[in-house]
């Protein structure tokens, strides 16, 4: 892969470990310049309280998404809508989706069909359908604190 000029990275905080985010950013930065770093979640939830310090330190834009119905979050939908808006801006040559959620498979397909490079980052449990629709998928378990990884490439 050639060096990418402008990378947009979107993070599903509900399905990602904050302890790995710095290593993810370091790894993705090897491919090019990350110009968008956004994390989506309901930051009012106790489960995401530990993200605040890292979000500030790593200059990630936190996108608040409230849960409109008990037991159901809207984070996935907000992330997808924003990503499609970024795609139609026509200024990014790569998108990184950080999540282990198979719900992002249609998004990866749309991005891929639009001709941009698609990278996924998630746990080994990430469904194959999502992993294979990415041009490259990086397993969180393979990222060390120093940012070295073993990526699965197509």
Predicted regions and their residues:
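VWA/integrin I-like adhesion module and closely mimicked acidic/polar interface patches used
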Residues: 108-140
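Conserved acidic residues
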Residues: 7, 93, 135
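Acidic beta-strand-to-loop metal/phosphate-binding motif
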Residues: 40, 93-100, 107, 111, ...
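Domain-level signal for Mg2+-assisted phosphodiester chemistry and nucleotide/NA-binding surfaces
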Residues: 1-88, 109-110, 117
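Conserved nucleotide-binding/hydrolysis micro-motifs of P-loop NTPases
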Residues: 15-17, 43-46, 102-104, 125-126, ...
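N-terminal regulatory modules in eukaryotic regulatory proteins
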Residues: 146-154
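Short gly/pro/ser/thr-enriched loop/turn and capping motifs at secondary-structure boundaries
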Residues: 72, 125-129, 145-147
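Short, ordered loop/turn segments at secondary-structure junctions
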Residues: 13, 67, 100, 116, ...
